[in-house]
Amino acid sequence: MSCFYLDLLKIKDPSFMKQLDIQELEALAADIRAFLITSTSKSGGHIGPNLGVVELTIALHYTFNSPNDKFIWDVGHQSYVHKILTGRASQFDTLRQHGGLDGFPKRKESIHDVFETGHSSTSLSAAVGMVIARDIKKEDFYVIPIIGDGALTGGMAFEALNHIGDMGKDMIVILNDNDMSIAPNVGALHNVLGKLRTSNTFQQTKTNIDKLMRKIPTAGEKLADTAEKAKDGIKHLLVEGTFFEELGFMYLGPIDGHNLEDVITNLEIAKRTKGPVLLHIITKKGKGYQPAELDSRGTWHGTGPYKVETGSFIKPAKTVASWSSVISNELMRLAANDERIVAITPAMPVGSKLEKFAKTFPERFFDVGIAEQHATTMAAGLATQAMKPFLAIYSTFLQRAYDQLVHDVCRQKLNVVIGIDRAGLVGADGETHQGIFDISFLNSIPNMIITMPKDEEEARQLMDTAFAYDDGPFAIRYPRGNGPGKELSESSKLIPIGEWETIIQPVDAVILTFGPTLEQALKAAEQLEDLGQRVGVINARFIKPLDEALLHRIFKQKIPILTVEESLLKGGFGASVLEFMEENNYTDVTIHRIGLPDEFIGHGSVPLILESYGISPTGIVLKINEMLAQSE
């Protein structure tokens, strides 16, 4: 470890770097790595991506002048070094905690965070907008999007590349190529980049030819200029064409992204170049920390706390399986008996626990990369051929495929089973990753069934019901983390479409809820019983369609009704119950909703966030007592 003279906690902005020589910059890099490893070992975070961009980030801030020059960090989880160099090292003990330092770029956090990210493949389009605004306003600054090879597989990135090349405006795109995104990359572009990584022969040959020609007296310069086409021919012979030059970029690289001097030199070349430039740098995810460097699965992409000395994770004893594992295990069981079942994931095989499925049924498993729109319509295509596709996708990423859900899946009433992972609050990743919008946007689509199980047994039953259903798409939501630990019975059963479960018969009032908030409702009902209130609890496992027969019986009791959901109130489950009440003219019933407000929910622990919005036994008890008092 280095002993750099500058205390990282005292950095206020990147201007100090301009006075450092290359050895001092390298010492700074070593200190930043040590700081990141120590800090994230306590808090957790995206350690792998950040260790890989230490030299790149230092070189960017050394070469350019932030915030006048604009850095846009695609996905944004690799912005920790940027945060350190822009004066936020002292806040790292609050990283991803409620009210603390955000794990992604945040405009309100620093003037150096010019664009907020969290989902992938957005940086290039944002950069196009900034470049156009700059030129219209006749301003002078550089726009530098930094995008990874994984994010570059997203369709939005290709759309932007096409536009950038066509515009021909000044822009410097940094391709941070570490041969991984969260999991190992897939797809044809990955193969193209692989060829470019090994094309040093071409780069050296091109440079040497140019130098030799320009040494020829008198005619040398002209000969070098007219030889460009010949050199392009050599390029095609050696690397079968460079994708980015065909799009209109000047391509620089590939270069070693951990060689500070080389990175700075190439950034200076890019600054002096007119038109769009793509600088292709090769980095090692997890650089400088052996457990992260050796990671081939994506385990060290983002972690909880860990022991620095051993690289072992500090986790509470795991006694039950995760929700993702429960769903994946049932998918495996079903697929073993039905060759029509196919699994699709957009770059999340590890998080969705589909690795075992991929090994067992390789011909029926498809990781399509960061391509949610393609994954969804691909599932629709499979369904037209009597296959049974299972689309495993995080709630926050399902947003990206809304049109495909509407136009390709639901409109055609195709039998696609959608496993909506990380549904509800996810905690530390904050605004960009909370899975709180899917109910609202799926509720508006005809032919869509939306469900959420209360425990592992019901998850299994809903999976079996979904694959037996043959009248359109069927979504199963499940949260991040572990289930409640319900043991599975020897055999499963199908649940009638739209049928809820009465767990406690309502007398004085009733709570309608589903998924993990059911446990909180039961605790609240127990507390209310101690107070002499007989409050029913209904497991509304079908969010759409509603159990209208049961709702009619409840409304006719004329007792207070409380809906509880870990999702947005606008367009949510409670809103659907209110619509039912209005449509059926139940005007003499008191009904209230507990859920998340019309705002983006920041990072922090899930229990703390839930408590702050009253989605807890305490909040439920208070609301029920308030409603009962009003109805007297």
Swiss-Prot record:
Q: Which SMART domains match?
A: Transket_pyr (SM00861)
Q: Which reaction does it catalyse?
A: D-glyceraldehyde 3-phosphate + pyruvate + H(+) = 1-deoxy-D-xylulose 5-phosphate + CO2
Broad class of enzyme this protein falls into: transferase
Q: Which Pfam families does this UniProt record tie to the protein?
A: DXP_synthase_N, Transket_pyr, Transketolase_C
Keyword field contains Metal-binding:
yes
Q: Name the residues that bind Mg(2+).
A: 149, 178
GO CC: one term? cytosol
Pathway given for this chain reads: Metabolic intermediate biosynthesis; 1-deoxy-D-xylulose 5-phosphate biosynthesis; 1-deoxy-D-xylulose 5-phosphate from D-glyceraldehyde 3-phosphate and pyruvate: step 1/1
Extract one GO molecular function annotation from the record.
1-deoxy-D-xylulose-5-phosphate synthase activity
> Which cofactors, if any, are listed as required?
Mg(2+); thiamine diphosphate
* UniProt xrefs under CDD domains: TPP_DXS, TPP_PYR_DXS_TK_like
Q: What is its EC number?
A: 2.2.1.7
Q: Which domain of life is it from?
A: Bacteria
What Gene3D superfamilies has UniProt attached to this entry? 3.40.50.920, 3.40.50.970
Q: How is the cofactor bound?
A: Binds 1 Mg(2+) ion per subunit.
Reported function: Catalyzes the acyloin condensation reaction between C atoms 2 and 3 of pyruvate and glyceraldehyde 3-phosphate to yield 1-deoxy-D-xylulose-5-phosphate (DXP).
* PANTHER family with a match to the protein in the record: 1-D-DEOXYXYLULOSE 5-PHOSPHATE SYNTHASE-RELATED, 1-DEOXY-D-XYLULOSE-5-PHOSPHATE SYNTHASE, CHLOROPLASTIC
The UniProt family comment states:
Belongs to the transketolase family. DXPS subfamily.
The annotated subunit structure for this chain is: Homodimer.
Q: What is this protein called?
A: 1-deoxy-D-xylulose-5-phosphate synthase
What species does this protein belong to? Listeria innocua serovar 6a (strain ATCC BAA-680 / CLIP 11262)
| Taxonomic path | Bacteria, Bacillati, Bacillota, Bacilli, Bacillales
